[in-house]
Amino acid sequence: MKSFFWDFFGPRAEGTAQHFLLHLREFLSKNQCPEMPTGLRSEGVGHQAVFCSPPLEYQAAIERSLRPRRSTEE
C-alpha cells in the first residue's frame, strides 16, 4: 500500500499539521473517497507529518490534487 506524507517543520509544526489534517479529511469527504488511514505522526523534534494511505484507485487523484511532499510503498 502506498502512503503519502505532508511534512511540517518548526515550533508550530504540530498545530499546522493538525490543521492540514482537518482539511485533508474534508477533501476526502467532499470527494466521496472511502475511509482510509489518515493521521499525524511525529518525525522528531520540530517535525510533524500528516499521512494518508489511499486505495490504488484514489492515489493519482490525491497525488495530483494535494501534491504530497513524499510517499512510501509498504
Where are these regions (language model features)?
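Positively charged, polar, low-complexity stretches
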Residues: S29-Q32, P68-E74
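N-terminal acidic leader/helix
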Residues: M1-K30
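Small/flexible residues
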Residues: F4, E43, L66, S71-T72
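Short, intrinsically disordered low-complexity segments
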Residues: Q32-S65
